[in-house]
């Protein structure tokens, strides 16, 4: 019932809900980034290491 939705905020503290939502989104963002860093295709930090190792191995 749309007209009675405001009563939800009488039960739940809006500050607590906003802090909880922000904390959850932060944890979710970190989780997604670490999952991507764990893959070979989407790891944006170690992109040049394999190419440098392959070049060094080919020159040796």
Swiss-Prot record:
A Gene Ontology biological process term: photosynthesis, light reaction
**Where does the protein end up?**
Cell inner membrane
How does the record describe its quaternary structure? The core complex is formed by different alpha and beta chains, binding bacteriochlorophyll molecules, and arranged most probably in tetrameric structures disposed around the reaction center. The non-pigmented gamma chains may constitute additional components.
- What is the designated name of this protein? Light-harvesting polypeptide B-885 alpha-2 chain
Q: Which chain regions cross the lipid bilayer?
A: 17-37
Q: Which residues bind a bacteriochlorophyll?
A: 33
Topological domain, Periplasmic: which ranges?
A: 38-60
């Amino acid at each position: 019932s749309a007209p009675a939705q405001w009563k939800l905020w009488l039960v739940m503290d809006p500050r607590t809900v906003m802090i909880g939502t922000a904390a959850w989104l932060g944890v979710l963002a970190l989780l997604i980034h670490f999952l991507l860093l764990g893959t070979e295709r989407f790891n944006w930090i170690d992109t040049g290491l394999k190419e440098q190792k392959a070049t060094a191995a080919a020159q040796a």
